């Protein structure tokens, strides 16, 4: 049995083929929160309160809570959960990032059904809007491969937006443009007849919206994230009733404007771009694209900001939260 794994900044998604031939998914929030008890009694009470939740007890007696439970605990304490990843790769900002990512990946992927089981996972492309040395895809890929090797998988990495192309462009002869809007980055792939000809990323996405809205309103990132995911707002129409959602709507507008300008600059005159004879489908996926009005606003900004390729349509992936994981599974099945 082959598997696919979307190793995202905000979510880890495992895809596998079910008994009936359908694709099954396992989602896990890519987050952690540490509670350090002050007394032995507090330690016992905290552990009782964590029954049924996913956590690891650390060597110093603290509790590392994982997944959605980490977000809930952080919000309860008016704090922000942490992540082992930042902008699509293992975070250099968290000293425990590699260890926590190992806990999470092993929780999600589990042990291989047999030694050498095929698994394809996704990695981001090099960003076009960041020129420093903080972004290291190679190290990130090696870390993930090592963790999966410990689970007895034979793993291979592919580009995140390339995986989205495999998932969503089958009816378009695998020709078009795919954008995966994750929490940390936007990954872009231009594909021609199944060949990825241009791949790059930009470094602002859903997390940037949360951070800027948090700064504007004085809330924590986790509170903003929770309100954004549960709230009712439309991009470009700030709410007058909720200042957090009003800020989120405003920064979504800025994010889409920024990204479409980066797309135009990165692709204009790109030597690897073919001369496409027909207009191209543009597919968007990822949790950031779930906001109301996203597709229409993105299509409008593409046109306004001079996207250099002919566009047939802009459409949502059939399953925006799972499309990349599905593409990884498709790649794994043909290896």
Model-derived regions, located:
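Nucleotide/phosphate-binding catalytic cleft detector across ATP-hydrolyzing
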Residues: 1-58, 62-178, 193-202, 206, ...
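A structural feature that tracks compact, well-ordered secondary-structure segments
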Residues: 187-189
């Amino acid at each position: 049995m082959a598997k696919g794994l979307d190793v995202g900044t905000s979510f880890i998604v495992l895809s596998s083929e079910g008994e009936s031939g359908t694709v099954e998914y396992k989602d896990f929030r890519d987050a952690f929160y540490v509670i350090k008890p002050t007394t032995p009694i507090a330690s016992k009470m905290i552990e009782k309160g964590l029954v049924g939740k996913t956590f690891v007890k650390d060597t110093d007696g603290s509790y590392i809570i994982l997944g959605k439970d980490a977000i809930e605990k952080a919000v309860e304490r008016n704090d922000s959960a942490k992540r082992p990843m930042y902008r699509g790769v293992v975070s250099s900002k968290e000293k425990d990032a590699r260890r926590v990512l190992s806990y999470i990946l092993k929780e999600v992927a589990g042990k291989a059904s047999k030694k050498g089981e095929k698994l394809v996972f996704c990695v981001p492309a090099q960003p076009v809007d960041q020129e420093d040395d903080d972004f290291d895809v190679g190290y990130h890929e090696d870390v993930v491969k090592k963790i999966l090797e410990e689970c007895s998988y034979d793993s291979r990495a592919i580009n995140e937006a390339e995986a989205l192309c495999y998932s969503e462009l089958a009816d378009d002869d695998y020709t078009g443009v795919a954008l995966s809007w994750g929490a940390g980055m936007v990954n872009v792939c231009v594909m021609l007849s199944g060949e990825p000809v241009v791949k790059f990323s930009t470094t602002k996405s859903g997390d940037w919206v949360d951070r800027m809205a948090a700064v504007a309103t004085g809330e924590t990132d986790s509170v903003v994230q929770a309100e954004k995911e549960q709230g009712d707002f439309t991009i470009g129409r700030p709410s007058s009733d909720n200042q957090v959602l009003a800020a989120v709507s405003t920064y979504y507008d800025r994010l889409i404007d920024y990204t479409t300008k980066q797309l135009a600059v990165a692709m204009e005159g790109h030597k690897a771009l073919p001369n496409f004879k027909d207009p191209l489908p543009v597919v968007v996926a990822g949790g950031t694209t779930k906001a109301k009005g996203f597709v229409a606003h993105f299509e409008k900004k593409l046109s306004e900001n001079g996207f250099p390729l002919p566009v047939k349509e802009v459409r949502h992936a059939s399953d925006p939260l799972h499309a990349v994981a599905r593409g990884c599974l498709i790649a794994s099945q043909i290896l």
